[in-house]
Amino acid sequence: MSRFDEASNWLVQRLPMFQRQGGTPATYRMDLDKTRQWLQVLGNPHQAYPCIHVAGTNGKGSTCHMLASIYQEAGLVVGLHTSPHMLDLRERFRVGGRLMPEAWVADFVEAHRRDIEDLELSFFEATVGMAFAAFRDARVDLAIVEVGMGGRLDSTNVVMPLASVITSIGLDHTAFLGPDRSSIAREKAGIIKPTVPVVVGEWDAEILPVFQEIALANNSQLHCVSSQNRVFLTDLQGDYQAQNARVAIQTVAVAGIPVLEHQIRRGLSKVAANTGLRGRWDVLEKRPLVVADSAHNSHGWIPAMLQWNRIRGSKRAAMVLGVVSDKDLTELLQTIPKDCVIFGCEPSIPRALELTAWVALLRDAGLQVRACLSAAEAINQAKAEGFQAIYVGGSSFVVADALAAYRDGLVSKRNHS
């Protein structure tokens, strides 16, 4: 095992991780004290460069990648912090669209393993510090920093950004962020800083007063993005990406770093190539069509299903779906197309909803179901049965499993249709 693999495995297996275990006192802390202590140990690397801070129920990851791509096209060295990762924890802290060297990660963990243990950091706290340190060591000109969950208490909420961005507000993580959209908006608006401009991508009557109140209290100018805002074409598939692009364009306009229009256009047209984004309406195969998407809550799932129904048309269609155990699945189950055959699977994380329970829920919803042990098995079986369009999702962890299966050659490339 390489030094990098040892370091990566230690971080993933040893440290409390929300994505794997769900919310516990060890994975979701109700203050930023540990994060601040950790950053002090590291020499406060987050203070070494300007940044843009992005929160939101959905769209924040794509918007971060768009911003990184735009600023890269403008000639800046850009650090990009996002989560969760799909295949490699270094996806959480890219520089110029590239992963940090494996040796850097191994050296960092060896140097700070005792600090991480002594502070009893969660995986997210540890990797946020890693990201900020990586960006300092790489001498970035700008960092794009995605919030992990919420905003007010998120470990990233130690930065003083050029702009604060809130892409959207939906019902997700309600046990931590509040029972309604107004409460969730208040938590996410916790990233608003004094005099720092704020860009919001969703602002209906339920949540706009929250943004107005907190922006006013911070003397921050509020910029509300609508479908009337200008938009340029992006290479990212997914109908929802147009609004993310509008948010990115508005953010560039208020952040204060000069960027030319042709650089914005080029950045939006090369997001995946410039930043390595995967898992957002990601076409894994064309014949048959296999598309993976990370939509995992009703706010993201409903538009994803509208697009799925449109692109599959009259094709014989299947869906490879798996979920985590701590989500409200009511809306998801109600909106799965009844004419699709469902290949139920279990994401390879401890938080996964166990397969027999998931299959039972699908059958109770009146769906045609096949039970499969893994995403790879499900995709292979759907292809073997001749389905012409296959959707992979329900959870970002199912998407990650599918990407890993394709990478490792576990999906048959033979076209059975």
Where are these regions (language model features)?
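N-terminal leader/targeting and accessory segments in enzymes
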Residues: 1-58, 62-77, 87, 197-199
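ATP-dependent carboxylate-amine ligase catalytic core
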Residues: 22-32, 36-48, 73-159
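Short internal beta-strands
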Residues: 81, 197-202, 318-321, 341-349
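Extended acidic/charged loop-beta regions that coordinate divalent cations
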Residues: 84, 130-176, 205-235
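Nucleotide phosphate-binding/pyrophosphate-handling subdomain across enzymes
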Residues: 137, 142-145, 154-165, 169-171, ...
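Internal gly/pro-rich beta-alpha loop/helix module
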Residues: 162, 176-191, 195-254, 260
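C-terminal helical cap/extension that packs against the catalytic core
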Residues: 204-223, 289-291, 331-389
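A glycine-rich beta-strand to alpha-helix segment
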Residues: 377-407
